[in-house]
Amino acid sequence: MNYQALPKIDLHCHLDGSVRPQTIIDLANQQNVTIPSQDINEISSLMIAPETCQNLEEYLMRFELPLSVMQTEEGIERISFELFEDAAKENVKYFEVRFGPQLHQLQGLSFDQIISSAVKGMQRAEAMYDIKGNYILSILRTMDKGNINDVIDAGAAYLNKGVVAFDLAGAELPGFCHEFIPYVNYAIEKGYRITIHAGEQGVGQNVFDAVSLLGAERVGHGIHIKGHQGAYDLVKEKSVALETCPSSNIQTKAVDVLSNHPIKAFYQGGVLITINTDNRTVSNTTMTDEVRKVMEEFNLSREDYFAIYRVSVEQSFASDEVKQELLKLAE
């Protein structure tokens, strides 16, 4: 099967984990930012996580270098454009990218400037390539909560004009959902769709809470519903899709090896699953790679692929018009 040629949808990808290494060097030189090396191989090695990290925290350390050059409007716009360009070149037809505006204020940018720059980069790529996209605004669970509503307010001006959803991301502690109920409710009032990182690090109860307390329509990763019957049943009952990211799950030790990833069991059991990259640079992957790995490891057919593709379309936060165009590609 020609995996490159398949139309693809990626619903879970982080902007700051998907930066071209050469762009880090270029922007650092333009911005007078000190980086450890001018050698692209060394920069790449600092950005790409090992095949298996000790834990999620070691994986998340790989984001410090790209964030150092994502503190200007020009830097954010370029990186946004290049990510959509890279995806378009491997036949990703619809792409939801997420990022945390709170992480881009080190040089004084406003949330409006940050969000606007990301959206502009995406729109520049949409005008040049056969790709459509949207942004998801991620709040980092470990950061100060004082400006969460400010992020929501700034993004509200871009709702359905490049921004569609609200997310909680970063290190996952048991029971985190309770702390964020008022913020998620505020986002829902403003018109945001909701996806939540949960069940990545062994806590199935977090998935149950994300759906029951926060109204999550999709769950980032969610693989640990496998050991939590209540969460498993709720996800099926509510038709909540899991945004699975196979390579990333192995790197962060959420799963030990791909053959033990629950994605096929979920698929066969009627759980709605999607295949995604998570971080193209940090995980050293593409959608083509992720699809190939899953298809070959679990012996899935072309029909299986397009069944998963249709779930991705239906569970996306795209407009009905875009969804209709995407579904035509599966006929």
UniProtKB/Swiss-Prot annotation:
Can you say what this protein is called? Adenosine deaminase
Q: Which domain of life is it from?
A: Bacteria
Top EC category: hydrolase
Residues that hold Zn(2+) according to the record? 12, 14, 197, 278
What is stated as this protein's family in its record? Belongs to the metallo-dependent hydrolases superfamily. Adenosine and AMP deaminases family. Adenosine deaminase subfamily.
EC number(s) stated in the UniProt entry for this protein: 3.5.4.4
| Family annotation (PANTHER family) | ADENOSINE DEAMINASE (PTHR11409:SF43)
Q: Which InterPro entries does the record associate with it?
A: A_deaminase (IPR028893), A_deaminase_dom (IPR001365), Ado/ade_deaminase (IPR006330), Metal_Hydrolase (IPR032466)
Q: What residues form the catalytic site here?
A: 200 (proton donor)
- Reaction(s) this enzyme catalyzes, per UniProt: adenosine + H2O + H(+) = inosine + NH4(+); 2'-deoxyadenosine + H2O + H(+) = 2'-deoxyinosine + NH4(+)
Instruction: Report whether rRNA-binding shows up as a keyword of the record.
Output: no
Quote the record's binding site residues for substrate: 14, 16, 170
Annotated organism of origin: Shewanella woodyi (strain ATCC 51908 / MS32)
